[in-house]
């Protein structure tokens, strides 16, 4: 959920009321033209201009301010910033202060809480993990990792001398979207057995087919990519 808020002139500010009227009117008109509902926040603007705030709700229903768009008629004048207009006269430009994410750390925190660590494939730090059952499959597991990496995916191998059930459980708890298991049959057939972190068994498929599947999951940009 995204909430939009229009923050207007604070008590302590720079610039004339005329400039503030123009700036506030411009932002309100932009919101109205876009058909976006918004709340008015009197007195919450920056000292140099009004702003539109984009606030996000996390999984607990808390509201966090993230992106902002501020319209500033004042600082260009104070900085003596000018441009030559079509009639060859010098005019002061209008400055837009745009923060797409706001605080980067806060935005990452919201994403982590929203997805509860189970990032969709396009966002997951590790998109797929390749696990061998015995040492005999280690070389093929590394080949699969290299193939996926060369295709632009974030994949890694887990070649530890642990039971496959232990590896699957561990990477499921780490919420890696796709778990690839390689045994003797997979080496013989040059395939991978694909599971999701939710426990769904997608069966065996050639590495190229899985790469296509993962590419489609990434392109969807959402949780449904593991369904």
Curated annotation (Swiss-Prot):
The record's Gene Ontology cellular component field reads: cytosol
- UniProt keyword Transit peptide, yes or no: no
* Annotated CDD domains: ThrRS_anticodon
User: Per the record, which residues fall in region Catalytic?
Assistant: 1-120
Reactions performed catalytically: tRNA(Thr) + L-threonine + ATP = L-threonyl-tRNA(Thr) + AMP + diphosphate + H(+)
Tell me the Gene3D superfamilies matching this sequence: Anticodon-binding domain (3.40.50.800), Bira Bifunctional Protein, Domain 2 (3.30.930.10)
Q: Where in the cell is it found?
A: Cytoplasm
GO-annotated biological processes: threonyl-tRNA aminoacylation
Q: Which SUPFAM superfamilies match?
A: Class II aaRS ABD-related, Class II aaRS and biotin synthetases
What keywords appear on the UniProt entry? Aminoacyl-tRNA synthetase, ATP-binding, Cytoplasm, Ligase, Nucleotide-binding, Protein biosynthesis, RNA-binding, tRNA-binding
Broad EC category: ligase
Q: What is its main location?
A: cytoplasm
Q: Which InterPro entries match?
A: aa-tRNA-synt_IIb, aa-tRNA-synth_II, aa-tRNA-synth_II/BPL/LPL, Anticodon-bd, Anticodon-bd_dom_sf, Thr-tRNA-ligase_IIa, ThrRS_anticodon
Single GO molecular-function term? ATP binding
Protein family according to the UniProt entry: Belongs to the class-II aminoacyl-tRNA synthetase family.
Subunit comment: Homodimer.
Protein function: Catalyzes the attachment of threonine to tRNA(Thr) in a two-step reaction: L-threonine is first activated by ATP to form Thr-AMP and then transferred to the acceptor end of tRNA(Thr). Also edits incorrectly charged L-seryl-tRNA(Thr).
State the protein's name. Answer: Threonine--tRNA ligase
Organism this protein belongs to: Pseudomonas syringae pv. syringae
**Gene label:** thrS
């Amino acid at each position: 959920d995204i909430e939009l808020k229009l923050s207007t002139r604070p008590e302590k500010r720079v610039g004339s009321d005329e400039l503030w009227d123009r700036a506030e009117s411009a932002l309100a008109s932009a919101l109205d033209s876009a058909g976006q509902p918004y709340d008015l926040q009197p007195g919450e603007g920056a000292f140099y201009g009004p702003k539109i705030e984009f606030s996000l709700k996390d999984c607990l229903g808390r509201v966090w301010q993230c992106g902002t768009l501020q319209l500033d008629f004042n600082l260009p004048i104070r900085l003596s910033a000018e441009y030559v207009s079509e009639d060859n006269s010098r005019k002061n430009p209008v400055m837009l202060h745009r923060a797409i994410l706001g605080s980067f750390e806060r935005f990452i925190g919201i994403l982590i809480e929203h997805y509860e660590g189970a990032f969709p494939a396009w966002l997951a730090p590790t998109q797929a993990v390749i696990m061998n059952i015995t040492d005999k499959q280690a070389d093929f597991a590394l080949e699969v990792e290299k193939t996926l990496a060369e295709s632009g995916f974030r994949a890694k191998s887990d070649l530890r001398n642990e039971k496959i059930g232990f590896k699957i459980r561990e990477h499921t708890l780490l919420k890696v979207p796709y778990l690839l298991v390689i045994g003797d049959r997979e080496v013989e057939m040059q395939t991978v057995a694909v599971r999701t972190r939710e426990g769904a068994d997608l069966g065996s498929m050639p590495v190229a087919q899985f790469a296509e599947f993962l590419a489609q999951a990434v392109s969807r940009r959402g949780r449904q990519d593991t369904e």
